[in-house]
Amino acid sequence: MQMNDRKQKVLWAIIQDYVSTAEPVGSRTIARKYDLGVSPATIRNEMSDLEELGLIEQPYTSSGRIPSDYGYRYFVDCLMERETLNPEELRKVKRAMSERLQEVNSIMQQTTNLLAELTNYTAVALGPQVGKTTFQQIHFFPVMPTKAVAVVVTSAGVMENKILDIPESMTPEDLQKVSVMINERLQGLTMAQVRASLCMELNEALKKQKQVLSRSLELIDEALHGDSGERFFLAGMMNIFKQPEFKDVEKLQNLLGILEQHQTMRELMHDHPEPGIHIKIGAENRHEGVRNCSMVTASYHLDGEVLGVIGLIGPTRMEYSKAVAVVEELTEQLSAVLKKCLIVRGI
């Protein structure tokens, strides 16, 4: 069975609708919302063929259809229209990247923040190792009555996260109190300074939350000592929680587990060192933890030499054309800004 123009239009419509709504798509929906010029019955026949070709599939609990990983791949390779950033987005990028950022780490974190902000996905980047790392902040995000995600950020942009067990009696307000106190007393300190001066004080102040405090300090230690080699930058962690796919706690744990394994992330991001945009969809990713996700990455360069990689991680139900446009633009801007910065600093 061959793909023809009508099948392509039906597949395109299914993907557009599913990306937009996160709901399985039926033939009546396509007939009503997309002007394909054919009846729901004809669309049903085409959907049956698309399912036979492996391009769409039926979720267990629904009569509608959703794209398969193969369907997304066909869309990206054959149907996707290239997009560019709109004028306001371009102004935002150029304004942010033209700020007088002196440190490479600041430039990398700014880039990662922009990637996440412009796409609403989670942004990752690998950059040169510069400077001495200090603790910046910790945040807790309750995900179950007895579990919370703890996220630690360092001055280098390194981010560590773990799902922590918390006492059943501990409220979100209690978690907020812990994070505020840790941030107020530890921000800007190295791990040696943390150990030397403040652990006893914090232990006294947070007697009732000792279990959470102990695990938090372990996580801070990992973050401050996990930046050997290329530094790993991450932004848009909260965007993960907005995606319906990751309301499944197991999927969420798998993804968060990968994001905290910086060496694994380095390997995943270095799969394609050659120039250009690279897209890996679902099962194309070689690590189990990201097989429910898609990754859009590109390397940035200095005089033809690869400096590092930036990219996005999101559900396979991703706006690929938007993701590609943002990664392309920021790769170009980052290469230009780092060229000036690294030459001046002699790195």
Curated annotation (Swiss-Prot):
Example GO biological process: negative regulation of DNA-templated transcription
Swiss-Prot/TrEMBL keywords: Repressor, Stress response, Transcription, Transcription regulation
Matching InterPro entries: GAF-like_dom_sf, HrcA, HrcA_C, WH-like_DNA-bd_sf, WH_DNA-bd_sf, WHTH_HrcA_DNA-bd, WHTH_transcript_rep_HrcA_IDD
KW Repeat (keyword) present: no
UniProt entry tagged with the keyword Transcription: yes
One GO MF term: DNA binding
Family: Belongs to the HrcA family.
Stated role: Negative regulator of class I heat shock genes (grpE-dnaK-dnaJ and groELS operons). Prevents heat-shock induction of these operons.
The protein's name in its UniProt record: Heat-inducible transcription repressor HrcA
Gene: hrcA
